[in-house]
């Protein structure tokens, strides 16, 4: 006679208890579901996922997230298949941020959710498209505000994702000022350390992958990077990433122990990183070839915005019918991929 089939050792209640136990083992400084400021619309807890994991999963399944794979980062309509897109940038930010969060015993789910959602609001043609919409829209346009607008209002046909406050805050406050990789851009410091991690990880990721893109494009050589950056951060891409992540963890732990927790870089690493950032603006972001592509992207964005503002009935979703035509046009155009924007401009006779 055969042995009876084994019974299931754990029920859903046990799964939830395990998740709660794992979260309770995080650093006292970590964000937790139990102390979250909640969602805009209350929801019952789920047995298999905690709040910030739900946020992360909802972001991954959005249309805006899928479109990131066809939005360029710096180089408009690049020739190489290896040039960074908003999608690959987002994944790199997620990887760097999760490594830091795990090392500091902070909430990885929240960190990932913020990282995956931080650039949902970016326009086609990189920052050039953002700058053009900022010029055209009466109230201005910022990609971080648009990212929040997407998760709050535009996804799910206007219902939004109903994300946790901490995820929404991190998405809004990830943007940085021009002065330094750690400066804010008018939105202040994120409410959580996890949000601070993503803000710094964004800089770590874009500076390093933009160097690789610029080298492939023939705009510079590794040996031309500032001596201080090469000496302090490392001679190549892996060394720089490793140094920046390790320095961040080490320096942040010092602030934890001092009772003034923050996500920071050491003074020497920050100086070298800011010098590298200034170098990239001078040699890459303001290079003639980069600016030529950006100008073309801006012309297309301006033409599409003008058309849809004048013809709001032609907007196929991705906007709120009650909004004024300018806002609807901005939502629609900013949601386009580079390819779709180019194709629509050609179809409408707007391409140059």
Located regions from the model:
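Short, internal active-site loops enriched in acidic
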Residues: 119-120, 177
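Histidine-centered, transition-metal-coordinating active-site segments
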Residues: 1-86, 90, 95-100, 107-108, ...
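A glycine- and small-aliphatic-rich helix-loop capping segment at beta-alpha/alpha-beta transitions
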Residues: 126-138
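Short alpha-helical catalytic segment bearing the HExxH-like zincin motif
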Residues: 111-116, 199
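Alpha-helix boundary/capping segments in eukaryotic regulatory proteins
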Residues: 103-104, 121
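Short active-site segment of divalent metal-dependent hydrolases/proteases
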Residues: 121-125, 205
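Conserved short loop/turn motifs at secondary-structure junctions
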Residues: 116-117, 134-135, 321
